[in-house]
Each structure stands twice: as C-alpha cells, then as structure tokens.
Design a protein with these regions (language model features):
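Short, surface-exposed amphipathic charged segments that create phosphate/polyanion-binding patches used
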Residues: 77-85, 161-165, 203-204, 278
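Acidic/polar N-terminal loop/beta-strand segments that form early-domain functional surfaces
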Residues: 35-38, 67-69, 266
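Conformational coupling and interaction surfaces
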Residues: 2, 21-24, 29-30, 169-173, ...
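Short, mixed-charge aromatic SLiMs
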Residues: 40-44, 73, 153-157, 262-279
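Active-site histidine-anchored catalytic micro-motif
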Residues: 2-9, 13-51, 93-195, 200
Length: 315
C-alpha cells in the first residue's frame, strides 16, 4: 500500500524537483501539498505550489494549502538562487483558485481523515506550518506517523549565516516548537545534503522536453545553475529538498543516529542555529533521529531514476 505523505514546501526550485518525483511515485500517495513562505513570500509560495501541480498534471491531484506569513515575518528569502518568483523567473501562467484553506488546517484535516499514525509530513521549508498545526490540533503529535524535516546542521556551518541553515533561520521559534514536540521526527541536515551537487552532466540525463516533467525541469533548473555560479562559483546546484524526499522513499541509503536537538532563538550571532547535545554523557533527552551519512552515489541515481519514472508515468 502506498505511503500517505503531506509535502510542506516553499517552492523553490529544489522543492519543485522533489514534487516532480513524489507526485508520480507509486510508493507514495501525496494527499496534500501545503505552501509555506521561505524561498519566496507566502503568496508566491502558494502560487508556485499550484503552478507546479498544473504544469505536471499528476494522475491524482492533492489538496492544496495556502501559506500565511510567520508571526515575526520572513527575515530572508531565496531570490538570489531561485529568482523573484521562486521558479527561476519562469512566470508560468496559473489559474485563479478560490477558497484554498490555510496550510495548517489542511495538514490537520488530512492527518485526522487518515487511519491513525499513517501520514508522514515531509517538511522541506521553514517549520511555520507544522508548528501552527500543532497549536491548531494539540494532539497532532500522537496521530501523525512521522515528520521528516530538511534543515539545520550538526557540526558544519550554516548557509544563511555562519551558524544557521536557511529553513530553521526563517522561523526559529517554529522550529524550536517542532523540535520540542512529542512527535516522531527525522532531521536531514546540511552536513548530509551538501554531499551531492547536481552537475550539468546529471542535468543532461533528465527526460527530454517531450514530457511534462522534462519540459518543466529543463525550464526551471538553468536559472538555478546560473545563481549557484554567480553566488558560490560552483558548476552545479544543491538539491537539499530532493535528498530529503529520498530519505523517505529510500531509507536504506541513509544512516541515522538518535540525538537531542534544540534551536537557538535569541542569540545575537547564532539565531536559528541547531544545537545538539553530543557530550560523552549528555543531559538532554534524545528527541529525534538525525541523518548523519548517506550513499551519495546511490541517492543521486535514485533521484535521476525517480525523475525518469515520473516522466514515464505521465497520463
């Protein structure tokens, strides 16, 4: 039976790539895609979720959730890598939708509508929606199956500040609330996702433009390559969110350790930093599994094969 998942995304080019794979994966039933502000503002993120789904036209359309601003506003965005529209300045046309419920309501409704503890939340952006859902439904932790989160670092540097990773930095208070929740959680940090760089050679292995998936990715990815070259001087792009999806679909390719993690919310230089008690005799209680390594070659192959499978399953 297919695994029920909710994709919580801030598209974002790598979010869009993850959606391409997940929406056509026969092992997944994507019951909802919920938007959150991060790489772009909440309104644009909501539009982009709808854009990706319209462009791909998967066999089963999931419920959509609309993003709203975090309580303290977004401190940063990802326009330097993803463009003003979050999808590489592609400006796809999109139909106007009415009555899209807030993301946190959609999350709670889908989890409550399913059999107990069978839905996995794949959180690929800031954790704003997940924290709000836990306020909206205080017992959510007991009925969600698992939360798999892309974010944070264990021992490496951040990517938006010297100490903080982008998703956690965008809404550290929300991340702190989710880290402290009683839910079953797995964190996929930068230490691991930075191991893979999607190169031009891999780009050339994508499906061609006769498929919707190939046409979409070949339009949105080139601006990301330019952004990474201009910002970082590298010939390739990181696909943090797609790797996180692989941790759900191919867990055998990843190594995890149980850890005790917290989020710094008030440091002058360290706001958004993820802190783990890794002392020989820790005093914090373990609260999540953290991915510490992966078979990078096999994960890369799984990403490419997942995209080709998506193109082959277009109706």
């Amino acid at each position: 039976m297919a695994r029920k998942v909710i994709l919580d995304v801030d598209p974002g080019i790598d979010d869009a790539m993850a959606m391409c794979i997940a929406l056509f994966d026969p092992g997944l039933e994507v019951v909802a895609v919920t938007a959150v502000g991060g790489n772009c503002d909440p309104e644009q993120a909501t539009r982009n979720v709808q854009t990706v789904i319209e462009q791909l036209d998967p066999p089963r359309w999931p419920r959509l959730g609309a993003a709203s601003p975090p309580d303290e506003g977004l401190p940063v965005d990802g326009r330097h890598l993803h463009g003003d529209d979050g999808l590489g300045e592609t400006n796809f046309p999109v139909a106007e939708r009415q009555h899209v419920h807030p993301s946190e309501k959609v999350i709670c409704d889908q989890i409550r509508d399913a059999s107990e503890a069978t839905v996995t939340i794949v959180a690929l952006g800031p954790l704003t929606n997940i924290a709000r859902a836990m306020v909206y439904d205080p017992e959510l932790h007991s009925v969600v199956g698992q939360i798999v989160m892309m974010g944070g670092t264990v021992s490496g540097p951040g990517n938006i500040s010297p100490a903080a990773e982008f998703n956690i930095y965008c809404d550290p208070a929300a991340a702190k609330a989710v880290f402290r929740s009683l839910s079953t959680k797995t964190l996929v940090p930068l230490d691991v996702t930075n191991q893979i760089l999607l190169s031009y050679d891999l780009f050339n292995q994508l499906p061609d433009e006769t498929t919707r998936v190939g046409r979409f990715l070949r339009r949105v990815l080139p601006p990301a390559f330019r952004g990474y070259r201009q910002q970082f001087g590298v010939e390739g792009i990181h696909v943090h969110d797609t790797i996180t999806l692989m941790a759900v679909t191919h867990p055998e390719l990843f190594t995890t350790e149980e850890m005790a993690g917290e989020v710094e919310t008030s440091g002058e230089l360290t706001t958004g930093m993820t802190v783990f008690d890794r002392r020989r005799v820790p005093s914090w209680r373990c609260n999540m599994d953290v991915v510490v390594d992966m078979d990078a070659k096999a994960v890369t192959e799984a990403i490419i094969s997942g995209i080709h499978r998506a193109a082959a399953r277009e109706r």
